[in-house]
Swiss-Prot record:
Residues 231-259 form a coiled coil. Its main location: cytoplasm. Gene3D superfamilies: 3.30.530.20. It comes from Dictyostelium discoideum. This is Phosphatidylinositol transfer protein 2. It is found in: Cytoplasm; Golgi apparatus. Belongs to the PtdIns transfer protein family. PI transfer class IIA subfamily. Pfam families: IP_trans (PF02121). The keyword Cytoplasm applies. InterPro entries: PI_transfer, PI_transfer_N, START-like_dom_sf.
Length: 259
């Protein structure tokens, strides 16, 4: 198993990030749903149980176009989708991913904590001693780290917010100076139980499936600040319902077009 803790310093308050993250997820879901792949929202409802109290979501992520054509052609449909279950008890969140094709041989879980500060909390997720020994800490810089796919409109080094006047984040040491400031801590467990492939696949999952996705998503999150700033949680729930209906319609249209 490969365990990494990603830390992202952001020029936001913890309260602002709650709205920003939910808005970003809804918008990114719509952007990624096209041509036979995308996201289907199964559940989005409150929960109150042993995991805490918050919002529970269940999604299916379709990957057909993310794989080489030959792989998509030979793999069963169960290998082309990922199931996501998330418990958002903000500021703590937990997300679990599974793939029906691999069953228990593929494990991916993400625990998140959101706190004020510049990434200085050494055990934000309250890990035990054994986990701390295995954990690799990786700071993600949303301005200076380069994603695999560059989008000019989502570049914090050149973006300036009209509503908040935050940005551009063009100082190499912006994380030491920016106000307001918070950190998103994400503890990621990745395990692929296939002898001979384990280390390589776990590294790919962490580097491409998690780190690059987090980097791109949070670059966009900051650059979309003028879209979400001032929204309430009620506004977000309405956007989520509209997104759920829109995604369902897109997926049905895609299925019909691919028949």
């Amino acid at each position: 198993m490969l365990i990494k803790e990603y830390r992202m310093v952001l020029p936001l308050t913890v309260e602002e990030y709650q709205i920003a993250q939910l808005y970003m997820v809804a918008k990114k879901s719509k952007e990624s749903t096209k041509g036979g792949e995308g996201i289907e929202i199964i559940k989005n409802e409150p929960f109150d149980n042993e995991k805490g109290k918050g919002q529970y979501t269940e999604k299916i992520i379709y990957l057909a176009n993310s794989l080489p054509r030959f792989a998509a052609a030979i793999l069963p449909s169960s290998a082309l989708k990922i199931e996501e279950k998330a418990w958002n008890a903000y500021p703590y969140c937990k997300t679990e991913y599974s793939c029906p094709f691999f069953g228990e041989k593929l494990v991916l879980s993400i625990e998140s904590m959101h706190l004020p500060g510049r990434g200085e909390v050494e055990n934000a997720l309250k890990c035990d001693a054994e986990t701390l020994k295995q954990r690799h800490v990786d700071f993600i810089d949303i301005a200076n780290d380069q994603p695999k796919e560059y989008i000019k409109e989502e570049d914090p080094k050149i973006f300036k917010s009209v509503k908040t006047e935050r940005g551009p984040l063009d100082d190499p040491k912006w994380r030491d100076k920016v106000e307001p400031v918070m950190t998103c801590y994400k503890l990621v467990h990745a395990e692929f139980k296939y002898w001979g492939f384990q280390t390589k696949v776990e590294n790919v999952i962490q580097d491409t499936g998690v780190r690059d996705v987090l980097l791109k998503a949070h670059r966009a999150l900051f650059c979309w600040i003028d879209e979400w700033f001032g929204l309430t949680i009620e506004d977000i729930r309405k956007i989520e319902e509209e997104t759920k209906a829109e995604l369902a319609k897109k997926l049905e249209e895609n299925k019909a077009a691919n028949k």
